[in-house]
Amino acid sequence: IEETSMINVIRNGFSIYDIQIDCAFFNPVSSKNPELEKQYQKNILSVIRQARFDDQGHSVDMLLCLNGLPVATAELKNPATDQDYKNAIKQYKEDRDSRNPLFRFKRGALVHFAVDPFQVHMTTKLQDDATVFLPFNKGRDEGSGNPDNPNGYRTSYLWEQIWQKETWLEIIANFIDHQIIPQKPPAEDKESLIFPRYHQLEAVLNLTSATRQNGIGT
């Protein structure tokens, strides 16, 4: 992980003395190989509430793991206690040390979510006060935010859709982009980890699902 990145190790595994160690198995393109399907079903997605990340007992509200490897964190806020996603963003910037292994860029969790019942924002790179969060919302009346949800919270799509096993594994396998922008000298190359916005993700997943169900057409 230190030599490459968390996303690279999750996707490609690593080798020890020429022995390949796979860290995750992703949905096979074809259902004709039952062994690949068995491997895919063996993936373990877990959620840890109040996950401690240092010796002082500090914790993050939620830690999502894939086969024991951290892939996402989330800070949850409730307006009933006079807090919202902005307080979660402030918490990430001021109280989450970007040098900590869980929060370190490339080394720790792939994405960090600031969540309240109305909005979701996310970032892939914690840089203390310089951290930039982007909306991960559906949109509301052609504007920002999320539409009303008669069956629950406006942000319930995050755990009811995005974090569901098949979708979450698809995102980790195919939708997170590690970009390197060459610089001179190479030691100063700029790197970023791109996590899709909600509408980008929804559009591609819908197209992929339709193609799998109906074929590519003629």
Predicted regions and their residues:
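ATP-dependent helicase/translocase motor core
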Residues: 1-218
